[in-house]
């Protein structure tokens, strides 16, 4: 079974486009599929449309009476997925605004079949990219990913901020069982939960990989929900929570992961963290030079 998780807030324009595309990609899957949507207090016709689509697609809806934010929506979605899935199932989490094309789902699933636990759709892999993203947003995104790579190094990952990912259901079930309600702890700090899931899964020794992905921001059909200042604050708070020597995540969870495995993050030092960022720094410099060339050639 493939379980697709969609956090939705004011997505009346996106749902009629996205749901048929998901269906077209997954309808032929031998084990079937299921979509779980969290309607996070939408003020438009999202709830009405979801009710209508329940007669067309294998769709379950979680309703929030008010807008609680991406953190709480993600928590409810992943806890529900852990409850209804079997260990052999796969979980796909993607955005509901039509910027994440379902056509990449097969490559995500194929990489899971290679033995990985978490596969991230990456703009930074060869063949990946993005359309419709301003130069400012590209700079912010790449800078944020550099920060995350330095302070939260995960083998096999360069793309930390994209929420388009595939998970083994057994990995999510193990994480929810291990962390309880703290699997997604920073629920009120914007998009910080997108990073938190990776960090928490890394602490239980999940295996990570990436596949190329093209972000279609030019197809976005709803207003952006991200508040950069709140998310930046969340990253700083998470850094303290992770590395605080008295009761921080590393101190509390290190060596206590299921099966007795130590998390790979435990062996990193500030020197190795900085060294690992060198490739990404060169990438940022190359991107700036490319933009300067394009500006000069116009």
Regions flagged by a language model, labelled:
Residues 1, 107, 181-298:
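Hydrophobic helical membrane-anchoring modules
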Residues 6, 31-41, 62-64:
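Short beta-strand/loop segment that forms part of the nucleotide-sugar
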Residues 11-26:
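Short, well-formed alpha-helical segments that are part of the catalytic scaffolds
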Residues 13-16, 42-53:
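Acidic helix N-cap motif at the loop->helix transition within catalytic regions
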Residues 18, 46, 74, 103-105, ...:
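Acidic donor-diphosphate engagement hotspot in glycosyltransferases and nucleotidyltransferases
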Residues 39-48, 66, 98:
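A conserved acidic beta->alpha catalytic loop
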Residues 60-83, 90, 100-184, 219-226, ...:
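Acceptor/aglycone-binding surface of glycosyltransferases and processive sugar-polymer synthases
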